[in-house]
């Protein structure tokens, strides 16, 4: 019964001394993640309370001055700037037009447990910043041509969808 938390970007900006995402989990394995902090009061990723919590091949970085406590586990990149492809300087807050791919100088390139990059890209699925499912079409329009029908009659619905990815 292992809980796996893979390929995420977690941004902590609260004024607490620790950032708790999981409360006392059992058999939690966090890998290929990027943990970012902006508040100077935050200096560690919670690694307590579970049995066990293991971090592998994850990157930590603080946009302020503190040094983040090293992660347990193996292959971690502690206190390393992720050098994202395109986000505002020193402001990693999520925005749909930010590019969270790793830049060429990032230590997270090819540093994941599978030899791919750490973070939201290069996991088991192709991440989409818009939140659309990657392997399914997404709905862009729905038209009901007969919105009042007697019981047992057909309701005519036309759907328009777009493919999320093209081959």
Model-derived features: positions:
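Generic short alpha-helical hydrophobic face used as a protein-protein interaction/packing hotspot
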Residues: 37, 62, 112-113, 163
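A broadly tuned, weak detector of single residues within folded domains
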Residues: 26, 51, 101, 152-153
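C-terminal accessory segments
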Residues: 73-132
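Generic hydrophobic secondary-structure signal
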Residues: 5, 34, 84, 102, ...
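Predominantly extracellular beta-rich ligand-binding scaffolds that present long acidic/polar faces
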Residues: 1-96
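Short, compositionally biased P/S/T/A/G/V-rich stretches that sit at domain boundaries
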Residues: 116-155, 162-166
């Amino acid at each position: 019964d292992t809980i796996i938390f893979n390929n995420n970007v977690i941004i902590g900006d609260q004024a607490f001394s620790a950032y708790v995402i999981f409360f006392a989990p059992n058999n939690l394995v966090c890998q290929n993640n990027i943990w970012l902090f902006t508040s100077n009061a935050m200096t560690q990723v919670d690694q307590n309370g579970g049995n066990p919590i293991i971090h592998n091949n994850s990157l930590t970085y603080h946009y302020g001055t503190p040094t983040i406590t090293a992660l347990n586990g193996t292959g971690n990149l502690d206190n390393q700037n992720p050098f994202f492809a395109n986000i505002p300087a020193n402001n990693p807050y999520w925005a749909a037009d930010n590019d969270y791919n790793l830049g060429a100088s990032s230590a997270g390139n090819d540093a994941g447990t599978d030899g791919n990059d750490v973070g939201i890209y290069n996991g088991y699925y192709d991440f989409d910043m818009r939140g659309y499912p990657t392997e399914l079409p997404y709905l862009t329009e729905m038209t009901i041509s007969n919105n009042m029908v007697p019981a047992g009659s057909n309701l005519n619905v036309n759907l328009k969808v777009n493919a999320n990815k093209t081959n």
